[in-house]
Amino acid sequence: MTSHQPQPQEEQSPQRSTSGYPLQEVVDDEVSGPSAPGVDPSPPRRSLGCKRKRECLDESDDEPEKELAPEPEETWVAETLCGLKMKAKRRRVSLVLPEYYEAFNRLLAPGVDPSPPRRSLGCKRKRECLDESDDEPEKELAPEPEETWVAETLCGLKMKAKRRRVSLVLPEYYEAFNRLLAPGVDPSPPRRSLGCKRKRECLDESDDEPEKELAPEPEETWVAETLCGLKMKAKRRRVSLVLPEYYEAFNRLLAPGVDPSPPRRSLGCKRKRECLDESDDEPEKELAPEPEETWVAETLCGLKMKAKRRRVSLVLPEYYEAFNRLLAPGVDPSPPRRSLGCKRKRECLDESDDEPEKELAPEPEETWVAETLCGLKMKAKRRRVSLVLPEYYEAFNRLLEDPVIKRFLAWDKDLRVSDKYLLAMVIAYFSRAGLPSWQYQRIHFFLALYLANDMEEDDEAPKQKIFYFLYGKTHSHIPLRPKHWFQLCRPMNPRARKNCSQIALFQKRRFQFFCSMRCRAWVSPEELEEIQAYDPEHWVWARDRAHLS
């Protein structure tokens, strides 16, 4: 009886769980594997350098079996790059794309951004973006930033490249976020200059004023920081957007009536005294333009050059002369000029009032020359440049060795035709004629000496001796006036006529030599002293009429 009794009700009916749903009976011989429902029995796969990832959920048994995706192919990728060497490693390309992970996470937690957090190189995870409101429509996501290879270090011919990601968050988004947190405050981050602390923030503009358009960000450029031989070190510096006139306008508002320009100091001197303030009653005058600054070479050593910035003065020398002329009317305002290593020159002798004023020779130009040089310091002084070059002195000394000129100077013992001043005028005429020094010959010496006697001497007789030494004894008695040439040429023999034509040619050459000097035959006493000071010990300068007894 007992064996045929039915089983209790509890065993026949399925048990109910606490939630009210019946529990399914599990048959052991249906599927071999773990007893946990919904688990993929396939062995787990591990990625390179990571722990085991969780397997995807098994699809429902009711759905038809889908075609399996092909196995991923393996490819060779560059692992490291060092100079010209590259190490390649074989890795498998994953078939699971990132968008599948995002779709899975979106189903688990609706309304949360499913994209995985991104971490920058060498930093911790960045904070997640704030969740957008559920009421707003979903916006189109920005495309993923592309990664690129950038040069990390550069050493000789070796270059190390590193892959970095381009950030999608632009600086203006940070500024917009800061503007929402603190309205009325400039959201731009503080900028620090190189080697300095943070600059003070600009003053906040009034809330009543309309917001002005922001100036564009200054561009950065590479500038040469140091220069040593053929090596150059470049450093990136930012170009400032604040111009000097803005500082001056700010200072003008703080102290009206005061010159806002910063004081400028000369090299090795203290600050200059400030200009006196003009009267408030006078109208404001137009300010003179600021002098431009330029870079000049201070020192030069081999391939190295040290440049220093110096300011060009706006005060010209003629303004100093006009100022001195007002202080002492009737006095020459030009500063006294002294020759190199000599005392003041002797003043010119006063010419007679009855004589007409002669044409003055052009004054030589003045320039700045180095007076002393000590280390890196140089003292400059303004001196007058002589118009007579050294090659003309050499040409004059070369002609003094001519035998005809030697006999002529030895004959003139009374110094009536060739004293030291007349010979100095010969050197001045050589300089004014402008011929090369090697072209001056014996004829040019006598042409210049004849022209010097025309300017300084009134006696015509001594000049006839020039033709005696130049052409012979026949021409010592011939007058020098052109109106007598043709009268004297008729009774002469053919040889005398030939010599007479030579004298006419000499007079023609004398006029051409005078025109080559631009008709400037007068030489100032100062220039004669300078010519003699070039070589004071020369024997020619001993030919002085004052020493004759």
Curated annotation (Swiss-Prot):
Expression by tissue: Predominantly expressed in testis and spleen.
Extent of Acidic residues compositional bias: 58-74, 131-145, 204-218, 277-291, 350-364
MF (Gene Ontology): protein kinase binding
UniProt superkingdom: Eukaryota
Entry's transmembrane regions: none
Biased composition (Low complexity): 1-15
Annotated region described as Disordered, given as residue ranges: 1-74, 126-145, 188-218, 261-291, 334-364
Family: Belongs to the Speedy/Ringo family.
Protein name, entry field: Speedy protein E3
Species the sequence originates in: Homo sapiens
